[in-house]
Amino acid sequence: MTISDVPTQTLPAEGEIGLIDVGSLQLESGAVIDDVCIAVQRWGKLSPARDNVVVVLHALTGDSHITGPAGPGHPTPGWWDGVAGPGAPIDTTRWCAVATNVLGGCRGSTGPSSLARDGKPWGSRFPLISIRDQVQADVAALAALGITEVAAVVGGSMGGARALEWVVGYPDRVRAGLLLAVGARATADQIGTQTTQIAAIKADPDWQSGDYHETGRAPDAGLRLARRFAHLTYRGEIELDTRFANHNQGNEDPTAGGRYAVQSYLEHQGDKLLSRFDAGSYVILTEALNSHDVGRGRGGVSAALRACPVPVVVGGITSDRLYPLRLQQELADLLPGCAGLRVVESVYGHDGFLVETEAVGELIRQTLGLADREGACRR
C-alpha cells in the first residue's frame, strides 16, 4: 500500500477505542489483506503541530488499553497501568500517548477472528504476518490521523520488536525509541518454545485447522496449555521457586492426583487468557515473533542496526530467560544512537518490564528527553 500523509480520520476521545481504516495492506510476503482496521486509544491532547505523540506498543497478548479500568471493548484493566497520565512517565499534560492493537490481534484490529469481505471470519485464510507488517499497519493508521512523525516509540517484548522495526524502518517518522526486553532477531530458544506453544494449540481437535470461530467450539485446552508454557518463560526461576518451591496446592496431594502450587498457578494463568484472547491471534502473532529478524533484507543484523540514525534507550532485565541480557547488549553495541545498555534489576524475569514500573518509568523519561533533543536538532 502507499501510505498517505493526508489525514482522513480523527483520534478517539481519551481512553476510548477508535477504529482506523487503512485500506488494503500488502504484506512483506506479497500477500494482501483487504479492509484493514487498526484499533487505537489515546491519552493526552494532540498538539496543534501533531508532534507530541508517544506510541506505546504492546506485547503478544496485550492490546491498546495501556492504562485505566476495564470498560467497553477492553474487559481487563490497563496492562501497563500508570505509564501514561498527568505526572506519569508519559506525562499527558505534555505528551499524547497513542496505543494500537496490533495487526493480527483480537481487540478491534483486523485478525483471524475478524470478518473478511465474504462476511465470514478470516480463520485459516488469514495470512502469516511479520513484525514489519505490524509496524507498516501502525504507520498507516497514524498517517490516516495526520500524524506523520512521532516523538517516540516505546515497547517491550513483541512491543520492543515493533519499536525496533519502527526506528530501523521509519527513521524519518520517529525521533526516539525505547527498546525493552527484546533482541535483534528470534533465537533458537525462542523459536523452540514458541513453536511448541503453537503445536499445543493445533493439537487440540477443536482447532479445526483454524476455522473454529463459527462452530461453537474453540481450542481452549490447547490455548490454556500454550499459555502455561509461555508463562514459565515470562517469569524468573528464582521468583517462582521462592513463591512456590515444591509445595502442594493447599491440601491437595500430587501423589494422589492432586496438584502442586506452581501447577495451580499456571492453570490459573491459562484460564485467565481464555476470557480475553483468541487462539488464532495467538498463533499468528507467535509466528510473527518466530520470524522476527531486523536484518532480513537489510544486509544482516549488524548492517541494519549500524545504519539506524534514531536515538534509542535499550533496556534489559537481569533475570529475563526468554530475552537474556546478551540480546539487549547486542542492540546497545550496534545501534549508533544508544549510549549504553540500561539494566533493570529484577527477580520477575521477562515480565520485569511490566512489573518494575519505577525503573522502567525512568527509562521512558530518558527516551522522551532524547526525543526533545532530536526534535530541536531536526527543526
From Swiss-Prot:
UniProt organism field: Mycobacterium tuberculosis (strain ATCC 25618 / H37Rv)
Swiss-Prot/TrEMBL keywords: Acyltransferase, Amino-acid biosynthesis, Cytoplasm, Methionine biosynthesis, Transferase
Biological or metabolic pathway of the protein: Amino-acid biosynthesis; L-methionine biosynthesis via de novo pathway; O-acetyl-L-homoserine from L-homoserine: step 1/1
Molecular functions per Gene Ontology: homoserine O-acetyltransferase activity
HAMAP family given in the database record: MetX_acyltransf
Positions of the catalytic residues: 157, 320, 350
Name of the encoding gene: metXA
Compartmental location: Cytoplasm
Function: Transfers an acetyl group from acetyl-CoA to L-homoserine, forming acetyl-L-homoserine.
Name of the protein this chain belongs to: Homoserine O-acetyltransferase
GO annotation (BP), single: methionine biosynthetic process
Pfam families linked to this entry: Abhydrolase_1
Top-level enzyme category: transferase
Annotated residues for binding of substrate: 227, 351
Catalytic activity: L-homoserine + acetyl-CoA = O-acetyl-L-homoserine + CoA
Signal peptide positions (record): none
InterPro entries membership: AB_hydrolase_1, AB_hydrolase_fold, HAT_MetX-like
GO cellular component: cytoplasm; plasma membrane
Enzyme Commission code(s) on record: 2.3.1.31
Phylogenetic placement of the source organism: Bacteria, Bacillati, Actinomycetota, Actinomycetes, Mycobacteriales
